[in-house]
Amino acid sequence: MSDKSILEQALKICRNLLDIDPPATINKIKDSVDKVNRILQLSDEDNSYLLSRLIEVTGTDQDEPRILDNDTIIPWVIDKWSENADNRRFWKRYRDYLADEKKIAPKVISRLDELTDKILDRLADPDAHDQFDKRGLVVGHVQSGKTSNYVGLITKAADAGYKLIVVLAGIHSTLRSQTQLRVDEGFLGYDTVTSRSFSENNNLIGVGRIDPGVQAHSLTSSALNGDFKRSVAEAVNVNLRGTDPVVIVIKKNTSILKNLINWLSGKIGENYGENERIINNIPLLLIDDEADNASINISKSSVSSINGAIRALLRLFRKSAYVGYTATPYANVFIPPPEKAKELHKGIRLVVGNKDYPVGEDLFPREFIINIPPPSNYIGPEKFFGIVDENAIYDQQETLEDDSRSDNSIMHLYEPVKDYQPVEYFDNKDIAETVRENNLNFIPDKHQKDDAKPRELPESLRKAMKCFILACAARRVRGQINVHNSMLVHVTRFITWQNHIALLIIDELDRYRNRIEFGSPDFLDDLKMIWDQDFIPKTEEISVLKDVGGLDMTPVSWEKLKLELFPAVTKIRVRAVHGSTMLGGLDAENIQPVDYYENRKKGLSVIAVGGNKLSRGLTLEGLTISYFLRASKMYDTLMQMGRWFGYRPGYLDLCRLFTSSDLVSHYKHIAVATEEMRAEFDRMWLLRRKPIDYGLKIRAHTGILTITAANKFRYKKMMSFGFSGELEET
């Protein structure tokens, strides 16, 4: 087979030819391959690969979104685009970036183009209105590409005339930094870190390499400490009333939000009434990532600090649009409608130093709610764990335990951890206490910060580490060398425990590295057995599935794999991911962030040990192996912890989840509940219901799981359904 770069060039030419005359039929695909072959003189093997790859890429599809609207929509976006060919410069270079650099399927890009136009239509034309306040919610799937979606919306909004774009990017600095980098690549086109350091190096990245002439500014950077600071904003000296759009990516942090409000009010605000400031003629788009986390008001008698600050920021602008994004809308379902919330929180103001700002209405998405289906190559809980029928209500035990009715799309990529037993498993309290005292239990469900910590890793975690080494080596055999590889270890929320486990993993990894370097026969035999019994059959099973990238999952022989074991294990690093800089009392001092960007040229292979920082939003690049024993009783928390969902092009067959059988059962139940909720949403769409009717039924899991945190869950009503699916009186 030819060099990979030549095949990538051939693939790009074919896709460009197919874009000229859509749709991409099989005859058109063959014709494009023939034309490219005349130019590049490819081998028969190359032609066969190119044809298969094009069929796979063009075959990736995505259904249309379902939208609940408050009012009849009067489209304005298409007319705006048609006024001037240059009106979509931000979007056009982002579209080309997705196609050429990210290799996103044409149909998926086309759906994104349509969807972002539809969202903008439901906001407001910033040039045609003197005042507006629009609210909406976009519901996706965990790790399904929500960031790509809202970066696309940002580009369209900037093209349409929105001048200030604020992105609320979770509650942790690592997630904010990662989100800023995605904005740098997809919208700004330059590295916000090197641009601040006045580096002489070319700092163009992402879309900037496609069209560097499109200008936008940022008041924040992708550095871990690059959140909004008043001093930095003043030093950057960007004209907020200029022609170029400005983006600000911040954490959901009360003090940061207050500082931003104060600075914007003083910088571009005008006096309005007796004690109020207002910002005129600068349209604001506020993107709320993970809109169910921290943004929800959790106080019944007052307004939560972050919720109030977000509402005050929106209220500061005469022209504002709010769009929330989430994969777990369980809490958003129970936000009270505007009329009720207005009575609850009338006249409340946000105090910032010696100033105060009026708090606007709650974040209920009154204009629209959009449910986005994932692309056909997305691996979600229904494919990972299996559900029986997403549109029906089943007996709980039958749904969770009977896989006999499951279809062939279920991947079965999980392995039950059998050497893990919660203390509660033991009926005899004396036995349970003996287990705790003698440290026989690796991570008890209800362990405390100061409990005795494990002295060694359980066999299941040692096997997971071996699987990670094998996965890294196999990707190298497939030519995926300078790429990121990640393993997730999520077993505790306590920082001291995370560091202790990281230290145990570092020691174990050193032993594995030495055994591979010196060719330990027993260790290599162990690796070969795992490869032959587990990985080879799974590759054969998945490689025939075209909709998940199976054509790129070429079988790897042990002979070739063995040669890549040492290069693979040598690259692996261990990171304790929690963000604490206090080293006192910690075993492992390797508390660096998972620095993918700094290792972008050669790729980072990392075992990330963490807790809450790995639970929501943060993407682990090239994730193959997950070891997950963290118990939670909330639907939204468990789903967000599922970092293993998403896209694994060319290496899905190498992915594994090690977890307890209880957690597998919980995920199966939540998969059913979530798909039922989405089916109910689709039913409401067919009936032309409005967002205010978004009080969906969500299947409860009596006595074991709860839907969301109790303080987000006040406006609920419990119902009971019989086997017929009809409501029963209780």
PLM regions and their residue ranges:
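Conserved Walker A/P-loop ATP-binding site and its immediately adjacent core
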Residues: 164-188, 192-194, 200-203, 493
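Conserved RecA-like ASCE ATPase "motif II neighborhood" in helicase/translocase motors
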Residues: 217-282, 296-313, 611
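C-terminal helicase lobe and adjacent C-terminal extensions/tails of nucleic-acid helicase motors
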Residues: 388-528, 532-536, 543-549, 645, ...
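Conserved P-loop NTPase catalytic core
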Residues: 194-204, 282-288, 298-458, 463-474, ...
